[in-house]
Swiss-Prot record:
Name of the encoding gene: hisA
Entry keyword set: Amino-acid biosynthesis, Cytoplasm, Histidine biosynthesis, Isomerase
Protein name listed in UniProt: 1-(5-phosphoribosyl)-5-[(5-phosphoribosylamino)methylideneamino] imidazole-4-carboxamide isomerase
Subcellular location: Cytoplasm
Source organism: Methanococcus vannielii (strain ATCC 35089 / DSM 1224 / JCM 13029 / OCM 148 / SB)
Signal peptide positions on this chain: none
InterPro entries membership: Aldolase_TIM, His_biosynth, HisA_bact_arch, Isoase_HisA-like, Isoase_HisA-like_bact, RibuloseP-bd_barrel
Known pathway: Amino-acid biosynthesis; L-histidine biosynthesis; L-histidine from 5-phospho-alpha-D-ribose 1-diphosphate: step 4/9
Reaction(s) this enzyme catalyzes, per UniProt: 1-(5-phospho-beta-D-ribosyl)-5-[(5-phospho-beta-D-ribosylamino)methylideneamino]imidazole-4-carboxamide = 5-[(5-phospho-1-deoxy-D-ribulos-1-ylimino)methylamino]-1-(5-phospho-beta-D-ribosyl)imidazole-4-carboxamide
Amino acid sequence: MLIIPAVDMKNKKCVQLIQGNPDKKHVELDNPPEIAKKWVEQGAEMLHLVDLDGAINGKRVNDEFIEEIIKNSGVPVQIGGGIRSVSDALYFIEKGAEKVILGTVAIQNPKIVREISSIVGKEKVTVALDAKDGKVLIKGWTEKTDYSPVQIGKILENMGAGSILFTNVDSEGLLEGINVLPTKELVDNLNIPIIASGGVTTVEDLLKFKEIGVYAVVVGSALYKDMINLKDAILASK
């Protein structure tokens, strides 16, 4: 199981938000490329980059840092946040991103997944599913749909998604530990890799995800607040 450190960017700073709220930050650090370099030096085999400006208001202001990290990190990079069109996705793939992460656009228009995966290959297309109380959220967690993660996950899989990045919003950013059952439902019902995210605070949390068969776990706040040591986490996940 891969451990993937998160490098979330807002206004050209590396941040970690509480429950996705842009006004509530655990962490705010300068120089995201240096942060990314630190995680790679500690053994990260992949990086998870999010452009929060792109995600929140549709304006990508962090491309320069994103491109620098892709170019210099020496490990595969997956990038999400504000990717709302085929051209947005192709832009980052052409810059060297290993995977692009689609959010709301893929849930509202699943055909875009087929279009992108037919050009770049399904292994390069991840769709982010965020859920609360068993229902998928869209538009930065501001709207709740009537559909479960498994219902939408199956549609996306059929459309050519190569993997699903699943965030249990009930846990995200609270540093209170995890409930793996919603993630397990996806693992059990889909045939593509599931990347888990949200609420990890201990190596024990990571082992719970490993036990249910997830492909990878994205870890954010717990790394930045020194609750988890990345080297220990990687060792435990092997």
